[in-house]
Curated annotation (Swiss-Prot):
It comes from Drosophila mojavensis (Fruit fly). Pfam families: GMP_PDE_delta. It comes from the Eukaryota. Keywords: cGMP, Cytoplasm, Nucleus. This is Probable cGMP 3',5'-cyclic phosphodiesterase subunit delta. Interacts with Pde6.
């Protein structure tokens, strides 16, 4: 199968890689979690062990560093937070144009749910997955699932 046989999404995915991800306290800028792992691989459920104190933060700043061989007209992602398979929250992020053969850093802020909607870490631990779908406009590039453990 040559590169002409790949769909547009497959072609982008083949040259797409997450280099690292960092979570920071949005108020202080202090790093609370960092992982040098490609969380974009679609065929495996990834795991992330994050400090339990993340649940007490007003907002978290997420930094994704990624590389791409193909250009993207409108790089965006949709994220669903699921508890035991049921959607608790859904977020939409848009970065826009990404040049070919580049490495990029994308930072966005995620605000916590109201305290009245928060569950204790012992209930959430291992039962929360974050499903992230990466797109170029409406073309699905890849979908990844990360299971969260609070330490």
């Amino acid at each position: 199968m040559g590169s002409d046989d790949l769909s547009a999404g497959d072609k982008i995915q083949k040259g797409f890689q997450i280099n690292y991800m960092i979570l920071r306290d949005a108020d202080t800028g202090k790093v609370i979690w960092q992982e040098n792992k490609d969380f974009s691989a679609p065929d495996v459920e990834h795991e992330a062990r994050v400090p339990v104190k993340i649940l007490d933060m007003r907002a978290v700043s997420r930094e994704i560093n990624f590389s791409t061989i193909e250009s993207m007209e409108n790089f965006r992602l949709d994220q669903k937070v699921l508890f035991k398979g049921r959607i608790m929250e859904e977020w939409f992020f848009e970065m826009g144009f990404v040049g070919a053969n580049t490495t990029n850093t994308w930072q966005s802020t995620i605000e916590a749910a109201p305290e009245s909607q928060m569950m204790p870490a012992k209930v959430l631990n291992g039962n929360v997955t974050i499903q992230t779908s990466f797109y170029d406009n409406e073309i699905l590039i890849t979908k990844s699932v990360v299971r969260l453990y609070y330490i």
